[in-house]
Amino acid sequence: VVTPVPYGASPIFDEQSLPDALRNDHRTKAGTWGLLRMLEGEVRLVFVDPPSEQLVTPDRPAIIPPQATHHVVPLGPMTMQVEFYRERPELVEDADRG
């Protein structure tokens, strides 16, 4: 199994610098998968349709499917980054990109 490699990534955001665009409903474009990684702290990832929520922690990254409308709610101090893929990323529990 070949693990997809991200083609890009967001800046690293904290609870202060997280842009309003990510705090409000938005979505990735067609063909783009997101992988939300927490470096510290946690966020609530809220999907709109179908409605669901996921707690994202440093041990539990979250996959964001193409065109899935969602937003992020910081739960206290945190740092996070989103990686972007052209195919569904693999969740490897012990992956450490350094």
Where are these regions (language model features)?
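N-terminal first-folded block
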Residues: 2-32
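Double-stranded beta-helix
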Residues: 3, 9-16, 82-98
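Short, conserved beta-strand element in jelly-roll/cupin
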Residues: 30-45
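Short hydrophobic/aromatic-rich beta-strand segments that constitute the beta-sheet cores
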Residues: 45-47, 82
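Ligand-binding loop in jelly-roll beta-barrel domains
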Residues: 66-90
